[in-house]
């Protein structure tokens, strides 16, 4: 039996880039909660003792940017210099301007256009992907790496492993078999965890704790064997972390946010962007399309691409590939997608309820992935029932 190895990585919420994603999305949530028509393009960067929020925002909302920055940092666990950042004493810089009037007139006509007339906020191409190898219809190695990162945070916050600090990274290599285009995970080949830790914890305590409290609850026993390789804090020391150890920037973890290297990526980041930005809304609708194709039994594996021009509502192109796993030809699946999904940005916002802020909705997406999550706020994960003419037996 021929197999191959494929690897996906993840980082948890204390990684500096992910801290920035969460701040940008917390700002978006605050704007949308008060003004669902807010136009937000919010970037964040951070380094030792400093967080800066900058970008273009047009909103009727009254937003305290500094308060949002400090609250987000505090919730993640950055509460003192020795963990990488002190939420209450770090410098917070804000440089926010209004959306360019040139963009505003082209995209939403300064708020005069009907939803179906709203153009894409920029050009670009986005991909959605789904695979039947997990219940989430997501790649196995990506799901496991993401869940390990989430578990690291959980056992830090609940006190199970009090020596843990916020910044952590995970990586999982899975041995796969190709079943006529569908991916079948056979076993976990390698598990890698690098996590920031307290200065006082001995190295010989870190590995057993990570195996017992992080790896065992996440990776099913059937995927682990005597040949599985574990690299647990292989650098030997990871005390300096967070923004003190590395600079952070919004939008630098786009593969972690999506499919862990599977499928494809158009390059656009998600966090800090309102639904007129098709980098985000376009990627959400093609995920729903790909997931619905697989969940309805039309294919075992599927990728969908959509592309846009700035100011134009209708997509320029749609593409589907089922990697040879389709139960009907791909050209017929493409017609089914066109029939069941509306790819115009204004209609995506309505159909996926993307203008709704509050409940930390966008901020939830900014750590541990935008896809494969079981949460009613992740409306794009809802499978659409698809109707098509089945071939007569």
From Swiss-Prot:
It is found in: Cytoplasm. The keyword Magnesium applies. GO terms for molecular function: ATP binding; metal ion binding; methionine adenosyltransferase activity. K(+) binds at residue 43. InterPro entries: ADOMET_SYNTHASE_CS, S-AdoMet_synt_C, S-AdoMet_synt_central, S-AdoMet_synt_N, S-AdoMet_synthetase, S-AdoMet_synthetase_sfam. PANTHER family: S-ADENOSYLMETHIONINE SYNTHETASE. Homotetramer. Catalyzes the formation of S-adenosylmethionine from methionine and ATP. The reaction comprises two steps that are both catalyzed by the same enzyme: formation of S-adenosylmethionine (AdoMet) and triphosphate, and subsequent hydrolysis of the triphosphate. This is S-adenosylmethionine synthase. It comes from Pinus banksiana (Jack pine). The gene is METK.
């Amino acid at each position: 039996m021929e197999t191959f190895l494929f690897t996906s990585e993840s980082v948890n919420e204390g990684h500096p880039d992910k801290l920035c994603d969460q701040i940008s999305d917390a700002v978006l949530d605050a704007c949308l909660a008060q003004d669902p028509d807010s136009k937000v393009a919010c970037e964040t960067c951070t380094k030792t003792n400093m967080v800066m929020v900058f970008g273009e925002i047009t909103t009727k909302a009254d937003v305290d940017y500094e308060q949002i920055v400090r609250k987000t940092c505090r919730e993640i666990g950055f509460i003192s210099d020795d963990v990488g950042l002190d939420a209450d004493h770090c410098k917070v810089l804000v440089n926010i301007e209004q959306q360019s009037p040139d963009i505003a007139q082209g995209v939403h006509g300064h708020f005069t256009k009907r939803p179906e007339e709203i153009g894409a906020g920029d050009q670009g191409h986005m991909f959605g992907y789904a695979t039947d190898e997990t219940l989430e219809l997501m790649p196995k190695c990506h799901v496991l790496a993401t869940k390990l990162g989430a578990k690291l945070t959980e056992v830090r916050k609940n006190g199970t492993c009090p020596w843990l600090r916020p910044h952590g990274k995970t990586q999982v290599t899975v041995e796969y078999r190709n079943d006529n285009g569908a991916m079948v995970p056979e076993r976990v080949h390698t598990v890698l965890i690098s996590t920031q830790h307290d200065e006082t914890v001995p190295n010989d305590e870190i590995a057993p704790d990570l195996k017992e409290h992080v790896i065992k609850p996440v990776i099913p026993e059937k995927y682990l064997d005597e040949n599985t390789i574990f690299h647990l804090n292989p650098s030997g020391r990871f005390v300096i972390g967070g923004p003190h150890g590395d600079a952070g920037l919004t939008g630098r973890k786009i593969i972690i946010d999506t499919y862990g290297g599977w499928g494809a990526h158009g390059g656009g980041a998600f966090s800090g962007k309102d639904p007129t930005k098709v980098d985000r809304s376009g990627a959400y609708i093609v995920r729903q399309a790909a997931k619905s194709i697989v969940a309805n039994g039309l294919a075992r594996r599927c990728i969908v691409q959509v592309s846009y021009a700035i100011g134009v509502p209708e997509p320029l192109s749609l593409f589907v590939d089922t990697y040879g796993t389709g139960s009907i030809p791909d050209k017929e699946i493409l017609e089914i997608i066109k029939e069941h999904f509306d790819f115009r940005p204004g209609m995506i916002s309505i159909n996926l309820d993307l203008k709704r802020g509050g409940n930390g909705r966008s901020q939830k997406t900014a750590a541990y992935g935008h896809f494969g999550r079981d949460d009613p706020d992740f409306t794009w994960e809802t499978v659409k029932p698809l109707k098509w003419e089945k071939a007569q037996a």
